[in-house]
Regions:
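Positively charged n-region of N-terminal signal peptides that target proteins for export
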Residues: 1-4
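Conserved C-terminal helix/tail region of periplasmic/extracytoplasmic solute-binding proteins
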Residues: 279-312
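N-terminal signal peptide c-region/cleavage motif recognized by signal peptidases
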Residues: 14-17
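Pocket-lining segment of extracytoplasmic ligand-binding domains
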Residues: 81-82, 152-248
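Secondary-structure end/capping motifs
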Residues: 211-291
């Protein structure tokens, strides 16, 4: 009897030692195509018994950086400028894996309304996420001081009925959604105006210090899953479309093709890599509009050590 009890105890200990570690990656929005690689990592849990990756959707009322900083989730997806803004307030976060070379912010407007450059948008109504950093920089850089800002609610009908209005969106999705509804549109991407924050997965300094092997495992898994989701996009596409009411297969497929053309490195093994100079560039732009203090150090907001093969 004692031997049986000892065996059960030993098995229990082994279960504890080799238990799968579960980590949550909080997205910056509802499920959409640019998150495909993350969802692929969740699908691939069946092939791994060490770390289980759970993808949690974000949304307009979810503060990703705050939740990661508080320890509610282990990892989050957000723009690199948002990571630095949070760090300027003491969050102690670090970007570890870049999933898009720049956040696809865009300004969508009606054609044939006298817009030949971004400066022609001055004085018009603008549906925007109030307080978003990129717009503070664009507004100052291009002297757009008469724009009539109002909170973005995603109402495409209002845009369709208001020829002078322009609207914030993602270049991967908004123009195609308007096309699908028969609403003529043109766009000026924020990246083309010179503001290019990364879309980056981040975690806490604390987790990096206490469990670097876990962080490394997540980055390694993502490097594989992003490549896999591009080679065979159907599983993640089917899942994302099952969760989305605003995007159809054509819009989703178009977004993936745009990502390949303009948002991902030609060498997919480099997906995840980040250039320190890009963090400095965006930090300097944020300082220009007094979003960051002059002495803020952007090098404390990223860690390039986990994504291998970036600097060969």
């Amino acid at each position: 009897m004692k031997k049986i009890i000892a065996l059960i105890a030993a098995l229990g200990l082994a279960t504890t030692v080799f238990a799968t570690r579960e980590v949550t990656l909080l997205m910056d929005w509802f499920p959409q195509g640019n998150q495909s690689g993350y969802f692929q990592a969740q699908f691939d849990n069946q092939y791994h018994d060490d770390v289980k990756i759970i993808i949690k959707s974000g949304g307009p009322k979810i503060n990703t950086t705050a939740q990661v900083a508080a320890g509610s989730v282990e990892f989050g997806l957000q723009a690199s400028d948002s990571v630095m803004l949070a760090n300027s307030k003491g969050a102690k976060l670090k970007g570890i894996f870049v999933s898009l070379n720049h956040v696809p912010y865009t300004l969508v407007y009606h054609p044939n309304t006298g817009v030949n450059s971004v400066k022609d948008l001055d004085g018009r109504p603008f549906a925007v996420k109030i307080g978003v950093t990129y717009w503070k920089w664009v507004k100052q850089k291009y002297g757009l001081n008469k724009v009539k800002e109002f909170p973005l609610k995603g109402d495409l009908g209002l845009f369709a009925r208001t020829p002078q209005q322009f609207q914030q969106g993602y270049s991967l999705f908004l123009p195609a959604r308007l096309d699908a509804k028969g609403v003529p549109n043109e766009q000026i991407t924020v990246e083309s105006l010179g503001y290019r924050p990364y879309s980056v997965l981040f975690t806490t300094d604390k987790l990096i210090k206490e469990d670097p092997e876990l962080v490394q495992t997540v980055v390694d898994r993502l490097s594989i899953s992003f490549h896999k989701s591009l080679v065979d996009p159907k599983p993640t596409r089917d899942f994302i479309l099952s969760k989305s009411k605003k995007v159809n297969a054509e819009i989703h497929n178009n977004a993936i093709e745009l990502m390949k053309q303009d948002f991902l490195p030609a060498d997919w093994s480099k997906i995840g890599c980040q250039d320190p100079n890009r963090w400095v560039e965006v930090a300097n732009q944020m300082k220009e509009v007094n979003v960051l203090p002059a002495d803020f150090d952007p090098h404390q907001s990223y860690d390039t050590s986990f994504k291998k093969g970036c600097f060969k």
